[in-house]
Amino acid sequence: MAINNQRIRIRLKAFDHKLIDISTQEIVDTAKKTGAQVKGPIPLPVRKERFTILISPHVNKKARDQYEIRTHKRLIDIVEPTDKTVDALMKLDLASGVDVQISLS
């Protein structure tokens, strides 16, 4: 029994781009094996957070360090998912460094 006219949208976030690419490929392979149509993965813009920290405690305002955190994002749409697709995605074990958000529409 297929879920008619529905779409599963999966958003992935991670700091490591290799980790998010591996997780994305696992999701796409799982969805295709169960007979669902997959659109994506679509790379979304990378969010860059920069922090500037003073090195010395009192003087030397010019002495600073800069750090950056990059958050990589991907979007996957699974069109016309079957019951097997939903079950397989629920059982899928992804890496711990990847944040997964799933929405049905």
UniProtKB/Swiss-Prot annotation:
A GO cellular component annotation in the UniProt record: ribonucleoprotein complex
One Gene Ontology molecular-function label: structural constituent of ribosome
Recorded superkingdom: Bacteria
Subunit structure: Part of the 30S ribosomal subunit.
Function: Involved in the binding of tRNA to the ribosomes.
NCBIfam families: PRK00596.1, rpsJ_bact
GO biological process, one term: translation
Primary gene name: rpsJ
Keyword Transmembrane annotated: no
Protein name: Small ribosomal subunit protein uS10
Entries under Gene3D superfamilies matching the protein: Ribosomal protein S10 domain
Alphabetized UniProt keyword annotations: Ribonucleoprotein, Ribosomal protein
Family membership noted in the UniProt record: Belongs to the universal ribosomal protein uS10 family.
